Curated annotation (Swiss-Prot):
pH dependence of activity: Optimum pH is 4.5. the enzyme has a second pH optimum at pH 9.
Cofactor: FAD
Record EC number: 1.1.99.29
PTM-bearing positions, type Tele-8alpha-FAD histidine: 126
Similarity comment: family membership: Belongs to the GMC oxidoreductase family.
One Gene Ontology MF term: flavin adenine dinucleotide binding
Reactions that this protein is recorded to catalyse: pyranose + acceptor = pyranos-2-ulose + reduced acceptor; pyranose + acceptor = pyranos-3-ulose + reduced acceptor; pyranose + acceptor = pyranos-2,3-diulose + reduced acceptor; a pyranoside + acceptor = a pyranosid-3-ulose + reduced acceptor
One Pfam family named in its UniProt record: GMC_oxred_N
Name of this protein: Pyranose dehydrogenase
Assembly and interaction partners: Monomer.
Active site: 529, 573
Positions annotated as glycosylated: 98, 113, 198, 274, 341
């Protein structure tokens, strides 16, 4: 158990001596009965996650508007571990929805854990903090799919740069050789740093990038729109060595015209007279407590995330008529696209025999160091520093390229610590090895298979049915097979000779397609970068759930802003795309009432 410490107050200090009046920060309420009865909210945001707090913060910049955020989990300020980058793993399962998928046929009937954050800030308070903008091809593809050129790379890059505050990390080492400053912003809300952990593995990777530059070239900055090669990792951590999330970067700077109700679930959005005008929210603290309704003067913005948002819409009568009817819900807006198109990334791991020194550390000592100076291993986002982005050659794709374009990788290697590991189930030979370094994980960035979210019943407190349809398309395991072979080539470089032996997971003799498919059937998992369950589409499209202005098709007074509207999982981690979509949505919403 990580020890609790006194909570810090990050509110802005008064500038009264300078003659400047600064508004107090957002007001947090622990129970619905604590909400003030004399406030009419212009906007109600259902979900205080990554996107929801961006929207609330930006809308609150108009002092005339009152904004209410309703979050199912606790405040991040009540959870010490959210502040310490190296303690992210301690947040699960306590502050997680702890979802489980239905059995996946192609994985031998295995059900997979599906982590989603349940606290203020959502996954930005809970995740691995990796900051990737993905490829310019992804954004140009989003623009084409949605019919909105505001999502093209050339249009969205200025949005991302304005929101970013890139700086040196808590070690204050120079950034030269780690990033390209010209593609970063320095005056935004979201703090970003490059990684600087000193480990022997770093030099071997950099030497390999020189030796095998055709497949693994060194890439100075993965966020310039062309993420191909071996690169230094960037993290949403501030220069004080603390996590930067939507809760710390956005919410803490708002005025007291933002009210936040925590530990309360939005159960559905209520329409006026069972029509298509949805401006009221219904919420409760648990299944046995009374349900309360509040009406927004202007709009309701659903920001529950890729799982919760479609569940909220379906419980509100928005979804496929057949699905809703089977769960005893009256259909108010018949849209079978709700909950469909779940796009995620399949992943596996590689472990290998190595004589390199372990990179484990004494967590207790590291925590003392972090509390004292906000430095040391717990101030870092990862124990090693590099990501590798690999684009497979055309002859390995069997004529089908699922990527967004030539600037886009198919595979990501994310390197982890070197440590003694327990053997995976059934792999007894593993115990004969000395140290073992995993690549946790090896990710198929453009997994083609599409899954779905459906209702298990009409109880909003029940978990929905999550079907990833993992390996529903043959190209998906094929790309992971080639990723394993690519990783083996990297680890067989001259730089690694004498330090790294054969892979032990999968076994070194697993080389054929059949052998690797058998391995993948038992080792593949979701990298929980799910998007697309309320996909955005052109205004006139007969498919999709939200229009390019984030309004839910067939309704008024209702928008969705979160990962669920992003049409497909991009070449990278989804945190920054969610921030960018939310920043753009905030501008559109504000302009609607200017």
């Amino acid at each position: 158990m990580i020890p609790r410490v006194a909570k810090f107050n990050f509110r802005l200090l008064s500038l009264a001596l300078l003659g400047i009046q600064v508004a107090r920060s957002a007001i947090t309420y622990q129970n619905p009965t604590d909400l003030p009865g004399d406030v009419d909210y212009d906007f109600i945001v259902a979900g205080g996650g990554t996107a929801g707090l961006v929207v609330a913060s930006r809308l609150s910049e108009n002092p005339e508007w009152n904004v209410l955020v309703i979050e199912a989990g606790p405040s991040n300020k009540d959870v010490f571990e959210t502040r310490v980058p190296g303690l992210s793993s301690e947040l699960r399962p306590r502050f997680d929805w702890n979802y489980t998928t239905i059995p996946q046929d192609a994985l031998g009937g295995r059900s997979l854990n599906y982590s989603r954050a349940k606290l203020l800030g959502g996954c930005s308070s809970h995740n691995g903090m990796v900051y990737t903008r993905c490829s310019r091809d992804d954004w140009d593809n989003y623009a084409e799919i949605t019919g909105n050129q505001a999502f093209s790379w050339d249009s969205i890059l200025p949005v991302m740069k304005r929101a970013e505050k890139f700086s040196k990390d808590s070690s204050h080492k120079p950034v030269k050789g780690h990033i390209d400053p010209s593609v970063h912003g320095g005056d935004g809300k979201l703090s970003v740093v490059a990684s600087y952990t000193n480990a022997s593995f770093n030099d071997l990777l950099l030497e390999t990038a020189k030796e095998l530059s055709g497949e693994f070239p060194f890439k100075l900055d993965m966020n310039d729109g062309r993420p191909l090669g071996l690169t230094w990792t960037q993290y949403t951590i501030d220069q004080r060595g603390e996590r930067s999330s939507s809760a710390t970067a956005y919410l803490e700077g708002t005025g007291n015209n933002v009210h936040v109700l925590v530990n309360t679930l939005v159960t559905r959005i209520v329409s006026a007279e069972n029509g298509t005008d949805f401006r009221s929210v219904e919420f409760a603290t648990d299944a046995d407590s009374p349900k309360i309704q509040l009406r927004a003067k202007k709009e309701v913005i659903v920001s529950g995330g890729v799982i919760n948002s479609p569940q909220i819409l379906m419980n509100s009568g928005i979804g496929g008529r057949e699905v809703l009817g089977a769960n005893g819900i009256d259909t108010l807006v018949d849209n079978p696209s709700v909950g469909k198109n779940l796009s995620d990334q399949a992943a596996t791991i590689i472990m290998l025999d190595t004589t390199l020194p372990i990179t484990d550390y004494d967590v207790d000592a590291a925590l003392i160091e972090w509390k004292k100076s906000h430095t040391g291993p717990l101030a870092q986002g990862g124990r090693l520093n590099h990501l590798t982005w690999v684009r497979l050659p055309d002859d390995k794709l069997d004529g089908l390229d699922p990527s967004s374009g030539e600037n886009s990788p198919h595979i990501e290697f994310q390197f982890g610590q070197i440590s003694h590991q327990l053997p995976p189930s059934g792999l007894t030979r593993f115990s004969f090895y000395r140290h073992c370094s995993p690549i946790p994980p090896l990710i198929n960035l453009y997994t083609v298979s599409r899954g779905s979210i459906s209702l298990s019943n009409n109880d909003p407190f029940s978990h929905p049915l999550i079907d990833l349809n993992m390996f529903g398309e043959e190209i998906d395991p094929a790309i992971l097979r080639e990723g394993i072979r690519s990783a083996r080539r990297m680890l067989s470089s001259q730089a690694f000779k004498g330090f790294v032996g054969e892979t032990v997971f999968p076994p070194s003799d697993a080389t054929s397609d059949e052998d690797l498919d058998t391995f993948l059937k038992t080792s593949t998992f979701s990298y929980v970068h799910g998007v697309g369950t309320l996909s955005m589409s052109p205004q006139s499209a007969s498919w999709g759930v939200v229009n390019p202005d984030f309004r839910v098709k067939g309704t008024s007074g209702l928008r969705v802003v979160d990962a669920s509207v992003i049409p497909f999982a991009p070449a990278g981690h989804t945190q920054e795309p969610v921030y960018a979509f939310a920043e753009h949505a905030s501008v559109l919403i504000a302009k609607s009432y200017s």
